[in-house]
Amino acid sequence: KPKINIIGAGISGLCAGCYLQMNGFETQIFEKHDIPGGLCTSWEKGEYTIDGCAHWILGSDKGSGFYHMWSEILNLEKINFHHHEIRIQIKVKNTADKYGSKIFNVYNDLNTLQNYMLDLSPEDEVVIKQFINDVRVLQKYELPPLMDKLPLIPSIIRGIKMMRYLKFLLILNKQRKVSNYDLAKKFKSPFLKEAFELLYDGQEVKMLVFNFPQAVFDKKSAGYPIGGSLAWAQKIADKYTSLGGKIHYSTPVKKIITENNGAKALLVRNDVIHECDAVLSAADW
């Protein structure tokens, strides 16, 4: 079997290792930390999980493309996801809503969000419904498109259907020009105006950055994996080792040894050399 040495047991390194093992390669991963995950990590502090990475994972519903992608490696039916009712709460500084609250709730459910905003500002109905529609339009397109291998004729038919994504490019081009500041200016309600100005801590950001996650939150396609980021990474590491892969923890790589313009081995701690046919670097730095 061809031997591949992988640098880094983060999500990319672990997933690459899984696919290589499934396709007949012999692999081993070298990780300088003593746990898997890389930047996909979390800590337990008493009853709390401190998680600075995966606030949500795309693919928590069975109908999405990401669900099918993750399912090639993990059994998602055995993983519990939590779907939050409220995405974020924005504390408005200078105004209040008609109930006297200075908190603007961004609900994950689009119907709930629309009704909430219409209740706060009926006079902004046109702007609110256009805002919600911009998010709903994105839901009409599967991202990424499912591209399973098909026979010739069905493949041609699918290719013709994929032409509808040309319209999607036009939608993206339109939405990428509108920022939260631009949208805020359209509201008559001082409360909604200020809330959208503060959508990204007062920074001006394109609404496309907001709309994409909102579209998947509404469909419950982006849930939080119970257990946190480290538990998620550990599941992938367990899958990798079950496929026959090896992980060397606490083993920083000192050098990639090359010969005739090709990678031939890794020099790791204690000056141990691990020979291979190729090296795949999945380290950020």
Short names for language-model regions:
Residues 249-264:
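A conserved short coil-to-beta-strand element within the FAD-binding core of flavoproteins
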Residues 48, 95, 252, 271-272:
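Well-ordered beta-strand scaffold positions
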Residues 54, 284-285:
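Short glycine-/small-residue-rich Rossmann-like dinucleotide-binding loops
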Residues 2, 268-278, 282:
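Core beta-strand elements of the Rossmann-like FAD/NAD(P) dinucleotide-binding domain
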Residues 136-243, 250:
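Active-site/ligand-binding neighborhood in enzyme catalytic cores
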Residues 2-143:
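N-terminal glycine-rich phosphate/pyrophosphate-binding loop and immediately adjacent elements
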Residues 29, 247-249:
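A structural preference for short, hydrophobic beta-strand core positions in alpha/beta folds
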Residues 11-16, 232-236, 240, 249-253, ...:
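Extended, hydrophobic alpha-helical segments in both membrane/secreted and soluble proteins
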